[in-house]
Amino acid sequence: MLALTPLLDTISSPADTRGFSVAELKQLASEVRAETIDAVSVTGGHLGAGLGVVELTVALHHVFETPKDIVIWDVGHQAYPHKILTGRRDRIKTLRQGGGLSGFTKRAESVYDPFGAAHAATSISAALGFCAARDAKGENNSVIAVIGDGSMSAGMAYEAMNAAVDTTKRLIVILNDNDMSIAPPVGGMSAYLANLVSGGAYRKVRKLGKTVVEKLPTPIRDAARKAEEYARGMVTGGTFFEELGFHYVGPIDGHDMDALVSVLNNVKHFDEKPVLVHVVTQKGKGYAPAEGAADKLHAVVKFDVVTGQQHKAAAGPPSYTKVFAQELIKHAAVDDKIMAITAAMPSGTGLDLFGKAYPERTFDVGIAEQHAVTFAAGLAADGMKPFVAIYSTFLQRGYDQVVHDVAIQRLPVRFAMDRAGLVGADGPTHAGTFDLGFMGALPGMVLMAAADEVELAHMVSTAVAIDDRPSAFRYPRGEGLGLTIPDLAAPLEIGKGRIVREGTSVAIVSLGTRLAECLKAADLLAARGLSATVADARFAKPLDVDMLLRLAREHEAIITVEEGAMGGFGAFVLQALATHGALDRGLKIRTLVLPDVFQDQDKPDLMYAQAGLDAEGILRGALSALGIDNISAAGRRA
């Protein structure tokens, strides 16, 4: 049962916290933590990160006048406590559900979410944009970016920090170090020093000292500068950030409410240069099962609040992710040139399994997709067989490198694109909807999509065998169909699809895991007296043009089905048919794609039904192409 929350019950907006004492803020933080745990136990989601920033969230909304003052959360999966405090408590148990709250910050959801998030390292750049707009308008509000140490492995964060000093003198960056990867706080002395260097008296003395130093002879002046930097770096660890033009404060204990409130008040009106506050937090703080878990319960399904035991579904067939990893391990056992690269997602992509088998051939480059792609290009250029395992949505971050460093040079980098299609609870920011279009546009690219886990095994083998150009294969989140996978699947013939069912009236050409729904749609058509051919294209590029032309000759209509946006597989098929004159004889065609909107989170099956990509939707597409507006198909040729 949820603990009593007397203070939280009085909060309708962050303004209600601004008269609270520090003691009351501590109690409020405890209540927000309990509320967060209770909510996520019902919805599932990202738990550990949010628990780690409860005190910081309360302190930020207490010290700053949000939403006038802008707070931008990097990634956003730590923002559940923020949502509880900003008028969304009554809907917090709809997190990541259909029609409910997003699992990330979202502009359309609240004025307290000034900038949407989900991909890493965007916060400082966005904050600088807000700062420049504020300065241009002559306004005086604060702008705060909260970024984790994990996101600081992404180059975009440093690009923004490098530009900060030339953009504005008034920006606050809070570095949420929840992995103790930069520097731990050193007890009470650390908190004292952080408060000291953020205070006005220290800054005045330091400014006076700099003025005096500037009047000294050059050799003495340079020595004095270096000594000051060295001494300050020894005490605070902030020399690197100072070199970027920031005033560094920290590290401080991110769970010490007294220190947080004091330091944030000190830096609130700092306008000499951008300031970075280094806050050290503990992921999963305040919930024993999270504190004791290896991953700090970063992402969870529904769980029991008392024990922390997650209510995981009964084990089913292996996931597509696991099948990919297992197949790659098989090939690596007989081919020592195979290398695997991930951008901070080893468990999400299955490369944690590959890494256990072949640690010396596994590279986690951090949140650095651009580097991952060009690093793989370098490996390929020197004879290795690199596999970049990456979520489709994150490959977007490295697309220029795919074009410039891989495709133009025709280097045999293999892209394993996980989370293709719709992903459910994580919504539009994590959906893999565009890769067919942007990868299929590249000359020389071999682009495949697996219909099931056996096909995925064949595609891994195919990618291993392709050594004269780049290749990519896509597969969805979730479990396979439970099919038996060969010991070592054979490579596919490049650019050749397969006919799964022969028919006469309409040809349904599927790419990817919609094949099962296409077969169901064929059954529905058969029940209406219509005979359907079902084909698995396998390749979006190069297309099996011979198969497509044959289907065009022998059928009244062709329906293409894909788990992607317009401009992908269906567009490629239309282009091929038009080029070969197959549309000149009255062929009827429909391309079934995801709708031209960013679909909000829901269960994947419901999302595909909304998109018209389930069996009923495919049936409707086929009947429309055939000019049938009712359920009767009497008289149609069978």
UniProtKB/Swiss-Prot annotation:
Keywords, alphabetical: Isoprene biosynthesis, Magnesium, Metal-binding, Thiamine biosynthesis, Thiamine pyrophosphate, Transferase
SUPFAM superfamilies: Thiamin diphosphate-binding fold (THDP-binding), TK C-terminal domain-like
Protein's UniProt keywords contain Nucleus: no
EC category: transferase
Catalytic activity: D-glyceraldehyde 3-phosphate + pyruvate + H(+) = 1-deoxy-D-xylulose 5-phosphate + CO2
PROSITE patterns named in the record: TRANSKETOLASE_1 (PS00801)
Cited InterPro entries: Dxylulose-5-P_synthase, THDP-binding, Transketo_C/PFOR_II, Transketolase-like_Pyr-bd, Transketolase_C, Transketolase_CS
List of residues binding Mg(2+): D149, N178
EC number: 2.2.1.7
Cofactor: binding details: Binds 1 Mg(2+) ion per subunit. Binds 1 thiamine pyrophosphate per subunit.
Metal-binding among keywords: yes
Pfam families (UniProt xref): DXP_synthase_N, Transket_pyr, Transketolase_C
One of the protein's GO biological processes: 1-deoxy-D-xylulose 5-phosphate biosynthetic process
Pathway connected to this protein: Metabolic intermediate biosynthesis; 1-deoxy-D-xylulose 5-phosphate biosynthesis; 1-deoxy-D-xylulose 5-phosphate from D-glyceraldehyde 3-phosphate and pyruvate: step 1/1
Cofactor(s) this protein requires: Mg(2+); thiamine diphosphate
GO MF annotation terms: 1-deoxy-D-xylulose-5-phosphate synthase activity; magnesium ion binding; thiamine pyrophosphate binding
Residues annotated for thiamine diphosphate binding in this entry: H77, A118, H119, A120, G150, S151, N178, Y287, E369
Job description of the protein: Catalyzes the acyloin condensation reaction between C atoms 2 and 3 of pyruvate and glyceraldehyde 3-phosphate to yield 1-deoxy-D-xylulose-5-phosphate (DXP).
Quaternary context: Homodimer.
Family of the protein in this entry: Belongs to the transketolase family. DXPS subfamily.
Family annotation (HAMAP family): DXP_synth
The protein's name in its UniProt record: 1-deoxy-D-xylulose-5-phosphate synthase
Biological source species: Caulobacter sp. (strain K31)
Gene that encodes the chain: dxs
